[in-house]
Amino acid sequence: MQHLAIFGGTFDPIHWGHLLIAEAALQQISIEKVIWVPSLNPPHKKASAFRHRLAMLQLATQDNPAFTVSSVEKNRSGVSYAINTLTDLSVCFPNTHWYWIVGLDTFQTLPRWYRGQELAPMCDWLIAPRLVGGENIAQSELICKQVKQQLRKQSNTIHWHLLHIPLVGVSSSLIRKLYRVGKSIRYLVPEDVRSYIADHKLYSEDSE
């Protein structure tokens, strides 16, 4: 049985923080590959065109053989839901033990996800805390245990692992904001991604 991790998200744009999280998952958990899955229609966000986000992901991950980018959501109609993504990928990759990489804030909302109670036991959850440090790790672990308790009340089990990652104070929303006002995003994103953003005028008033 192979062990694969899904890293789903808007990735608008992908940045070094995302890449560090995926690399930490590879190093700390016995998985063979990380499958990056950009959301076609995120349920709570307005995002740049799917083709741009997919292209930036491909540029950022192309030099790591343990990273692969999936366009499984490309032809999906309606809102992108995690359980549909996992079901579709399970058809493409049978006989797989699945992991799902997710940020702590997002994991905290899992009990409220669409069919979240059904999704929770279908994979192991790899949690990226917002901050790294003694107190923050303890707080992150407490939040994960609270999610587990909420799901247990609904007769569901869940397995989670807290990833240990370097502190990176960067987010996609910060990058978009900086770029929109003409500030540098060099070293916040891979250079190929920065060039792509400039070439396609993303995150500006005349963006494609």
Swiss-Prot record:
Keywords: ATP-binding, NAD, Nucleotide-binding, Nucleotidyltransferase, Pyridine nucleotide biosynthesis, Transferase. It comes from Trichormus variabilis (strain ATCC 29413 / PCC 7937). It catalyses: nicotinate beta-D-ribonucleotide + ATP + H(+) = deamido-NAD(+) + diphosphate. This is Probable nicotinate-nucleotide adenylyltransferase. Belongs to the NadD family. The keyword Cell membrane does not apply. It is an enzyme of class 2 (transferase). Catalyzes the reversible adenylation of nicotinate mononucleotide (NaMN) to nicotinic acid adenine dinucleotide (NaAD). Its EC number is 2.7.7.18. InterPro entries: Cyt_trans-like, NadD/NMNAT, Rossmann-like_a/b/a_fold.
